[in-house]
Amino acid sequence: MRQPLSWGRWRAMLARTYGPGPSAGYRWASGAQGYVRNPPVGACDLQGELDRFGGISVRLARLDALDRLDAAAFQKGLQAAVQQWRSEGRTAVWLHIPILQSRFIAPAASLGFCFHHAESDSSTLTLWLREGPSRLPGYASHQVGVAGAVFDESTRKILVVQDRNKLKNMWKFPGGLSEPEEDIGDTAVREVFEETGIKSEFRSVLSIRQQHTNPGAFGKSDMYIICRLKPYSFTINFCQEECLRCEWMDLNDLAKTENTTPITSRVARLLLYGYREGFDKIDLTVEELPAVYTGLFYKLYHKELPENYKTMKGID
């Protein structure tokens, strides 16, 4: 099997397509015609990374010589590389472009590359190399928001807020967007503290709402998860920028009031049912399990499973 295109072969293609160019021991000259001597790149050589699906990843941030390359030369070199990858039977190209090298986006787009996603300091473009429509997976399809229903069982009070920047101020649970690699329960605890000053502990997941074409998610789909939290402090010190009001409200009152959203009303009634009949009837508890990827773990949320069913001891 032929090896993925290395930076040395990439430079050779650029040289063939753009005119006489650098061989080993030369680099692009900055602000001058021609080339100047430079030690071989050696350890800085970079091959496009071949993934298990036959795709090639090219990370321009690792190719220092591109800082002195113009867009036209890059386009010709990329075109030659794409032709080679097609001849090798590769499935796709993933082109990672740092924001400061964005001048290479238009040349790539002219060759058929499309945006896949962008981060704060880079963008990723893709090109499907096989026949037929692209089978590459899309980027993240959902935004994840998490709220905390902080319920004090001793007083039957629940913590609620009114957002400052809403057209209609209604009672709701404090919450916000989950951060990258942040567990659902941790998001709920963090958001509650940031908005209200109340410290709490994650107990369970109560509900999951899925909404498509959500204006608050840039028109994408949105997952809104409400967690049951147990309070460890009770003095409210709410964020004046985010919240108009914040208080401990009787759970019965929240379940009956019309001054709330449908989801808040439904979860309040769910909590009331759990308080009276047992939280085991409403809680989705969490357990950490090993992932199929070595060294990684995940959190699984489900109704409580008796220990003998977890171990299957004594189960026929």
UniProtKB/Swiss-Prot annotation:
It is found in: Cytoplasm; Nucleus; Mitochondrion. One of its GO terms (cellular component) is cytoplasm. SUPFAM superfamilies: Nudix. It holds the Pfam family NUDIX. A motif (Nudix box) lies at residues 176-197. Detected in liver, kidney and esophagus (at protein level). Ubiquitous. Its main location: cytoplasm. Residues 141-273 form the Nudix hydrolase domain. The keyword Mitochondrion applies. InterPro entries: NUDIX_hydrolase-like_dom_sf (IPR015797), Nudix_hydrolase6-like (IPR003293), NUDIX_hydrolase_CS (IPR020084), NUDIX_hydrolase_dom (IPR000086), Pre-Nudix (IPR040618). This protein is coded from a FGF2 (BFGF) gene antisense transcript. Belongs to the Nudix hydrolase family. Monomer and homodimer. PANTHER family: NUCLEOSIDE DIPHOSPHATE-LINKED MOIETY X MOTIF 6, NUDIX HYDROLASE RELATED. This is Nucleoside diphosphate-linked moiety X motif 6. The lineage of its organism: Eukaryota, Metazoa, Chordata, Craniata, Vertebrata.
